[in-house]
């Protein structure tokens, strides 16, 4: 796994499960092997109950997976945890699709609207807001200036195309590897 992919995974994990569980995911990514919760707790010098909470959280979000076996002596279940690479790739792909959807919506909004901004406060207003305030900044009273959103539209077009290409490439790559 590339360091860029790992960064994306950890960033997504931080958003979904918080910093502590993300540190555990980082540990498991480095290990690249199946480990029991007891082994993880020993290596990290953390109580096994704390490790289990984080493991369950990571598992709920699809970052890790486990298999369980029964200990022949005690009859208790032993859980072996590992990073779920296939699921993580799907999570990243879905996140990119969501970002793409938002960028397309923003592009349509930019395309279909006129904007004005206050040069003093650098606050942007759509046409209706500007008209309602008689083309004056409601905060400072300065006259609003027309905002040419051409650069914004070009940037959004570029990012949309870039993400569409990434999704297509990763979808094609993913379907070839299965």
UniProtKB/Swiss-Prot annotation:
One Pfam family from the record: TFIIE_alpha
Record bears the keyword Transcription? yes
Instruction: Provide the alphabetized UniProt keywords.
Output: DNA-binding, Transcription, Transcription regulation
**Its GO biological process terms?**
regulation of DNA-templated transcription; transcription initiation at RNA polymerase II promoter
Domain HTH TFE/IIEalpha-type as annotated: residue spans: 5-89
State the disulfide connectivity.
Answer: none
| Gene3D superfamilies found in the cross-reference section | Winged helix-like DNA-binding domain superfamily/Winged helix DNA-binding domain
* SUPFAM superfamilies, per database record: Winged helix' DNA-binding domain
InterPro entries xref list = TF_E_archaea, TFE, TFIIE/TFIIEa_HTH, TFIIE_asu, TFIIEa/SarR/Rpc3_HTH_dom, WH-like_DNA-bd_sf, WH_DNA-bd_sf
Q: Does the keyword Transcription apply?
A: yes
Task: Tell me where on the tree of life, at the top rank, the source sits.
Answer: Archaea
The record's annotation in SMART domains points to: TFIIE (SM00531)
Task: Supply one GO molecular-function term.
Answer: DNA binding
**Function description:** Transcription factor that plays a role in the activation of archaeal genes transcribed by RNA polymerase. Facilitates transcription initiation by enhancing TATA-box recognition by TATA-box-binding protein (Tbp), and transcription factor B (Tfb) and RNA polymerase recruitment. Not absolutely required for transcription in vitro, but particularly important in cases where Tbp or Tfb function is not optimal. It dynamically alters the nucleic acid-binding properties of RNA polymerases by stabilizing the initiation complex and destabilizing elongation complexes.
The UniProt entry's sequence similarity note says: Belongs to the TFE family.
Quaternary context = Monomer. Interaction with RNA polymerase subunits RpoF and RpoE is necessary for Tfe stimulatory transcription activity. Able to interact with Tbp and RNA polymerase in the absence of DNA promoter. Interacts both with the preinitiation and elongation complexes.
Q: What is known of its domains?
A: The winged helix domain is involved in binding to DNA in the preinitiation complex.
Q: What is the recorded name of this protein?
A: Transcription factor E
Species annotation: Sulfurisphaera tokodaii (strain DSM 16993 / JCM 10545 / NBRC 100140 / 7) (Sulfolobus tokodaii)
